[in-house]
Amino acid sequence: MTPKRERAVVCLSGGMDSCVCAAIAARDYEPYAIHFSYGQRTEARELVSARSVAERLGFKDLLHLKIDLFRRIGGSALTDTSIDVPKAPAEEAAIGAEIPVTYVPFRNAHFLAAAVSWAEVLGASKIVIGAVEQDSSGYPDCRPAYYEAFQHLIETGTKEGSIRVETPLIQLRKREIVRLGLELGAPLDLTWSCYSGAEEACGECESCVLRLRAFEEADAVDPIPYAHR
């Protein structure tokens, strides 16, 4: 008899990092995906990617949650159309030097809280999220200390049991994430990282620039279409 696998809830945005995390979870656990539509510019495109990735990897279920508070609060170029999404700095080294306008205030705490709630219901022991500190835009909710603090909150505020937050990519460089994804057979062709909602990725926002650079440094070809490379 095959041993019963631990269940894991994966925060699946549809982006490259969450896709690689999904591939890790599909390898190691019985995986369930949770996806959030929160008024972001790329809401529809991200949902298509998340569903496609979950299906390709054989996830048991995908829970799609709609959250209105970020759109109503505003303050981020991702949720407030009055704030332009900036192009990446001319000098790539400047990316992450300061918190950009694409930061959604305290977003990951809300995502994690919902994931923990569902994990309790499912009896899942793991929450997997694709936070990345290296080669990133400098978001404060993508640092190891943030997840260590949230782990303590889970242990304090949930019923008896053991739910752990896993951040398998947090210390990896982007090129290492690409290589890992290719090694695992992660469906990177289904992902979407761009902050634009156009048919093709813009190739000019910070997210696109970081992704394109990662594929180049990994000696690989990014399989998604770009308006500018």
UniProtKB/Swiss-Prot annotation:
Note describing how the cofactor binds: Binds 1 zinc ion per subunit.
SUPFAM superfamilies to which the protein is assigned, alphabetical: Adenine nucleotide alpha hydrolases-like
GO molecular function: ATP binding; ligase activity, forming carbon-nitrogen bonds; zinc ion binding
UniProt cross-references to NCBIfam families, sorted A to Z: 7-cyano-7-deazaguanine synthase QueC
Name by which UniProt lists this protein: 7-cyano-7-deazaguanine synthase
HAMAP family: QueC (MF_01633)
Biological process terms in GO annotation: queuosine biosynthetic process
Keywords: ATP-binding, Ligase, Metal-binding, Nucleotide-binding, Queuosine biosynthesis, Zinc
InterPro entries: QueC (IPR018317), Rossmann-like_a/b/a_fold (IPR014729)
Gene3D superfamilies (UniProt xref): HUPs
